[in-house]
């Protein structure tokens, strides 16, 4: 027969796609179960372990939607879930939070990682209906001028007209976030074709 060791698995989730400086600890989320008891065939294991259930994109958080994670799929090899709890739900408390929509002008867009030898023109004049969530006391005073938009072109290599996702955030407010996806239209040209000079390698 196999001798098992009883241990506690403490759960956590990781929030991805967070803007610079965002305070993840301020998010009002909770797990349906913070921890469960498991048994492990590895007798020298620690009495507790931290287990990441998975990731949640911050842009998908609207304080209403819940996220489900399967417990057994994240346990270590050989560990047995003793509780009968198969799913952990991550939910959010919307009390004290609200959302607003903003229109952000083109001059608040910063381009990063322009491809070598390319010129980039932003065709979009403004980004409408940008949905922002945050604490009510901040949302009551925040304005469109408080937002910065990052257009990161590190994944772009070819010329042409494309729609590209942007990151919207408020540098002065680290507890607000943008819900959903926002895009701008850009035109990418070879410098040689627009300036009649040779492109730089």
Describe the residue ranges of each PLM region.
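Structured interface patches
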Residues: 1-201
